[in-house]
Amino acid sequence: MIKKLNIFSGMQPSGIPTLGNYIGVLRQWKILQKIYNSIYCIADLHYLTNNKENSKILFKRSLDLLAIYLACDIDPNESVIFLQSHIPEHSQLSWILNCYTYFGELTRMVQFKEKIKNKKNINLGLLSYPVLMASDILLYQTDIVPVGKDQIQHLELSRTIARRFNKLHGDVFIIPEKIISKTGSKIMSLSNPNKKMSKSNLNRNNFISLLDQPYSIIEKIKNAKTDSDNPPKINFDIIKKPGISNLLSIISELRGINIKDLEISFKNKSYKYLKNEVTGAVLEHLKILQKKYFLIRKDEKYLINILKSGSKKAKKIARGTLKKVNESIGLLNF
């Protein structure tokens, strides 16, 4: 029997995920859990790098995100689902890996440079974020990491740290490989299709939340940016027609129709017609998802039990890896 490979991923509980997160991440997880030993965390420690809110908000958001995972058919019987903070080995390994990471490597991270723009006081957690991410991945002897294009640099640093450690101490860590989703890995902002759809954007018209009301979804897609071509031309061209390409990507992913086939079916159609079709596809998916979510979210005891069970499974793997790490560098295990 062929041994299943391990796959690891996670999301911060920084609010309800967007349609972009659903298409590019959560739907992929559902598929991947059938193929790999899937380990999915709620990254509440990463959340702290940018958020200093009271504990009740973080706890609520963590359970909200877990309910979203489950509503997207991430199955706790097939996948290990847990809270990052419940496994102290993440922080312990992160400290050790800090000692194998160079300051210059961290300051060169593109996301770090973006996040510190116009900020006076930069917390250390923001700088060392990629090291904690490396410990998340390496702690579970991860073979495969699904990443968006904006996370490739962080994963490459994880691989570099693992190789550096292994060179000194033997084959302690598996060197993880990446898998990148196709079109859906980057659904763009509705009002600025040159930027990724993100819930951190202050303009709520830029993104569709998975819990948006139908009237809000209709209005957001109605106002989505297209272009001024007359007559309208509905074809996929990210450079020349980013708005149209984004709408085509959304309907392609949700309806499972090839982009080329969509271009043929939308030939000589208006932009209004395209937007109506996209709206229908989004409403169709989110109606089902929201019904599941609100049913699951009501049962807080059930959600907490899932996290407890997942933590036990995750801790068993994490302890084994940290024991191996400690022994390799001379830290005593009793």
From Swiss-Prot:
UniProt motif 'KMSKS' region: location: 196-200
Sequence motif 'HIGH' region, location on chain: 13-21
Major localization class: cytoplasm
Function: Catalyzes the attachment of tryptophan to tRNA(Trp).
Superkingdom per UniProt: Bacteria
Catalysis performed (reactions): tRNA(Trp) + L-tryptophan + ATP = L-tryptophyl-tRNA(Trp) + AMP + diphosphate + H(+)
HAMAP family: Trp_tRNA_synth_B
EC number: 6.1.1.2
Quaternary state and interactors: Homodimer.
Example GO BP: tryptophanyl-tRNA aminoacylation
CDD domains the UniProt entry points to: TrpRS_core
Gene: trpS
UniProt GO molecular function: ATP binding; tryptophan-tRNA ligase activity
Record-given protein name: Tryptophan--tRNA ligase
Keyword set includes Cytoplasm: yes
Organism of this sequence: Wigglesworthia glossinidia brevipalpis
Keywords: Aminoacyl-tRNA synthetase, ATP-binding, Cytoplasm, Ligase, Nucleotide-binding, Protein biosynthesis
Enzyme class: ligase
Positions that bind L-tryptophan: 136
Pfam families recorded: tRNA-synt_1b
